[in-house]
């Protein structure tokens, strides 16, 4: 498996035609907007909800497709078709980068698998981050926008410091279904499977904690987890 994680910073030097013209984070004019595109499995759908929540907590506002200042593509490496769709989507978002100065990031399993190679393969991508680094997205954005660097964050969190995301009962109110995470990763390194390499080592959540989260969701009307 080799090295488990990577965190590097490289100088941002896109071609002149794609050089972004963007305001720094925290600018007092119009709020920054974002768009999250999801490819792959249900876990990615859940991760994209976390991505959106992380950006909104940092002051970003969801935008219509093609109108965002920040585009995050959440990827899947299990299914080849999902990876092909991601690469095709990146080509379409290049126009948005030229016309709006959009910041483009790639997260998820392809990001974890490719790491800095993705920056070389797609030179107009500004940042790459793995599944363990979703909570760090606002700080990644600051580095990209303020320091004008391209960023790769794919280091694994230690199992002792990993905190499982909890669904917020208030944002879940009125939903029929909701995701509850019980574990992540896998310790079985099978020759045909990339999960240990893209999702990390197995970390399980305490059973009482899972029951408590399900009970809190049931109180606000969720009926399926």
In which residue ranges do the predicted regions lie?
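Proteins enriched for Cys/Gly/acidic motifs involved in redox and nucleic-acid/cofactor modification
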Residues: 1-225
């Amino acid at each position: 498996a080799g090295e488990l994680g990577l965190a590097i910073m490289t100088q941002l030097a896109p071609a002149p035609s794609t050089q972004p013209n963007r305001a720094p984070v925290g600018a007092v004019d119009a709020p920054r907007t974002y768009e999250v595109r999801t490819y792959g499995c249900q876990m990615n759908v859940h991760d994209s909800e976390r991505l959106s929540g992380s950006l909104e907590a940092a002051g970003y506002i969801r935008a219509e497709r093609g109108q965002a200042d920040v585009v995050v593509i959440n990827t899947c490496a299990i299914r080849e078709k999902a990876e092909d769709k991601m690469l095709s989507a990146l080509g379409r978002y290049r126009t948005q980068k030229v016309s709006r100065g959009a910041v483009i990031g790639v997260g998820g399993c392809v990001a974890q698998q490719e790491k800095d190679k993705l920056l070389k393969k797609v030179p107009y991508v500004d940042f790459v981050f793995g599944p363990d680094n979703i909570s760090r997205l606002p700080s990644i954005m600051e580095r990209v926008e303020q320091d004008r660097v391209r960023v790769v964050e794919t280091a694994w969190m230690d199992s002792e410091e990993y905190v499982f995301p909890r669904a917020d009962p208030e944002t879940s109110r009125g939903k029929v279904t909701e995701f509850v995470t019980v574990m992540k990763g896998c310790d079985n390194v099978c020759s045909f499977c990339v999960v240990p390499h893209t999702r990390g080592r197995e970390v399980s959540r305490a059973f009482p904690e899972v029951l408590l989260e399900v009970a809190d969701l049931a109180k606000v009307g969720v009926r399926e987890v």
